[in-house]
UniProtKB/Swiss-Prot annotation:
GO cellular component terms, semicolon-separated: plasma membrane
Protein's name in the database: Proline-rich P65 protein
Record's subcellular location: Cell membrane
The organism of origin for this protein: Mycoplasma pneumoniae (strain ATCC 29342 / M129 / Subtype 1)
Residue span of region 12 X 5 AA repeats of D-P-N-Q-A-Y: 40-172
Residues covered by region (Disordered): 1-58
Source organism phylogeny: Bacteria, Bacillati, Mycoplasmatota, Mycoplasmoidales, Mycoplasmoidaceae
Post-translational modification: The N-terminus is blocked.
Superkingdom assignment: Bacteria
Gene from which this protein is expressed: p65
Keywords associated with the record: Cell membrane, Membrane, Repeat
Membrane topology: Peripheral membrane protein
Amino acid sequence: MDINKPGWNQSDQQATAYDPNQQQYYGDGSTYYDPDQAVDPNQAYYPDPNTYPDAAAYYGYGQDGQAYPQDYAQDPNQAYYADPNAYQDPNAYTDPNAYVDPNAYQDPNAYVDPNNYTDPNAYYGYGQDGQAYPQDYAQDPNQAYYADPNAYQDPNAYTDPYYVTSTDPNAYYGQVDNVPALEASDLAYEVTPQEQAAEQELFSEPETKVIREIHEFPFEKIRSYFQTDFDSYNSRLTQLKDKLDNAIFSMRKAIDTVKENSANLQIMKQNFERQLKEQQTQRLTSNTDAEKIGAKINQLEERMQRLSRTMESVEWTKKEPRQEQFDPRFVDPRNFNNYVNNTDTMMSMFEKVLMMNLLRSTTPVQPPVQYFTPQPLTASPRPVYEEPISASFRRRGYRGDEFYE
């Protein structure tokens, strides 16, 4: 059909309604559609590559939906990297479920929002307050997870009302404080007695039995029980030692004075003997010599009296020992040495010192064994549903995150 002829009419258009060689489409019969502008409703529409400016360039699409020529787009058989200088719309919608290529290139110099920074190398577990904790708080994901013990417990935190918080062990899932919420659905977890026994056999730990060690015996009670006895022995021994020290000191002093006095008396005796020999040979001329001799004799008598008093005091120390006041509670009635002359004999003193040394040589008080007290769980365990024992296989399919087939 010649589209350059001067005029068309209805009969012309109806005569050539569809030319398969020209791919011409006619709508209502009154409008002529250019084949380049027509859309085949039965086919997917692809833009004509010959209408692009660069017919040889491969056109990928960037993040803003605009086509980028070859220098921005890579080979379509390889990973596609967007234009790094592309404008980032801050209000653009980001699909939270979008696929993230784990091997994608991460620009190390990219700007990091300090309010949204997350350590890409950290393993993120979730603590009791629902916040993610990095590696130092979370354990290996292949092991049991322990929450951060120092985690902040928000008192106003939202708690799932369908968690079993009831203390009733027979409460079904969704019962809160014995107030029934939704009816338990047909898909609620059932655990048969066989499963329960298998779980118990596989995953349970034996009950902890307290085994008393030797250092757990109440040494402290025994020691404090006898402490009063040994305190009394100790004070009495110290008093006895002080008295003996004083007696030894006074006896040594008395012995020194006796030695000194005896030496002086020897000299005086020799002098008097010499004077007597001289007086026997010569006649007394005056009373002065006799007075001097009388004064010397009086002085000598006073010294002898003093010396005898000192010796008497030493003998009194030896003859009259101290009288001990015993508390009958602290005296062993089987030890007769306590009642010999009402004093401590050397044997009983030796026994007491030996007991005190034995007491001091015993092992000191050990701290008690630290047992780990189990901490309460955040959520109650799953309730158990009683089922009749049926000799059949377990229903196939996954049950939660358990390991059963």
